[in-house]
């Protein structure tokens, strides 16, 4: 779950825990982002087995370069759809790196991968080999 204000991460995790949630991952990125950020530090708070832990990460831990917010900013839905299709088609850009950053963290935090670098590799492979584009196209066919 993305939280725009990093100071609310632990409080939000505590609320989720009191409400009976067993697992949750909350993230907040530099610049008030509700996702991990390529700008600099991002915080991750994990609720797992009743325990709340936190960590701070930077893009370099993922093997990625930093980027300004202006380089990854989206736009209206139509523009964002084009951006997503370009990323899923293998276009290399800071926007792709932002997808890799957040996908990698999800893969590590869910136990699918052991390191952020491995998460980036797996996510990058799915983008490069057409797996994600195929999935997008199947979803389009099923949409009303």
Describe each region flagged by the PLM.
Residues 1-144:
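Glycine-rich anion-binding loops and their surrounding alpha/beta cores
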């Amino acid at each position: 779950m993305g939280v725009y204000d990093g100071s609310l991460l632990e409080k939000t995790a505590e609320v989720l825990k009191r409400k009976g949630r067993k697992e949750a991952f909350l993230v907040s990125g530099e610049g008030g982002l509700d996702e991990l950020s390529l700008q600099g530090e991002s915080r991750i708070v994990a609720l797992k087995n009743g325990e709340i832990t936190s960590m701070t990460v930077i893009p370099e831990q993922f093997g990625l370069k930093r980027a300004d917010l202006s380089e990854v900013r989206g736009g209206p839905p139509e523009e964002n759809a084009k951006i997503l299709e370009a990323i899923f088609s293998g276009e290399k850009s800071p926007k792709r790196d932002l997808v890799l950053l957040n996908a990698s963290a999800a893969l590590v935090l869910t136990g699918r991968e052991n390191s952020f670098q491995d998460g980036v590799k797996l996510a990058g492979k799915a983008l490069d080999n057409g797996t994600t584009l195929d999935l997008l196209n199947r979803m389009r066919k099923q949409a009303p």
